[in-house]
Amino acid sequence: QTLELEKEFHFNRYLTRRRRIEIAHALCLSERQIKIWFQNRRMKWKKDN
C-alpha cells in the first residue's frame, strides 16, 4: 500500500478527486485515508526540503 502511494506521490503531489477515488478502490482504503496520507506526505516532503 505504502509503496503504491509513494509511487503516486512521486508523480504527483496533489491528487484529483477522481484519482483519489481510483486509488482508494485499488487499495481498499477510504478516500479520506488517501487524502490524509497525501496531506501528511506533503508536510513531510516540505519539512525535508
Swiss-Prot record:
Keyword line: Developmental protein, DNA-binding, Homeobox, Nucleus, Transcription, Transcription regulation
The residues that cross the membrane are none
Q: Name one GO molecular function term.
A: RNA polymerase II cis-regulatory region sequence-specific DNA binding
Superkingdom, taxonomy of origin: Eukaryota
The Swiss-Prot or TrEMBL record marks DNA binding at 1-49
Listed under GO cellular component are: nucleus
Give a yes or no for keyword Transcription regulation in this entry.
Answer: yes
Q: Where in the cell is it found?
A: Nucleus
Question: In the UniProt record, does the keyword DNA-binding occur?
Answer: yes
Q: Biological process (GO) annotations?
A: anterior/posterior pattern specification
The free-text function statement in the UniProt record for this protein reads: Sequence-specific transcription factor which is part of a developmental regulatory system that provides cells with specific positional identities on the anterior-posterior axis. Also binds to its own promoter. Binds specifically to the motif 5'-CYYNATTA[TG]Y-3'.
* PANTHER family to which the protein is assigned, alphabetical: HOMEOBOX PROTEIN ABDOMINAL-A (PTHR45659:SF4), HOMEOBOX PROTEIN HOX (PTHR45659)
Q: Which family does it belong to?
A: Belongs to the Antp homeobox family.
Q: What name does UniProt use for this protein?
A: Homeobox protein Hox-A5
Organism, scientific name: Ovis aries
Q: The organism's lineage?
A: Eukaryota, Metazoa, Chordata, Craniata, Vertebrata
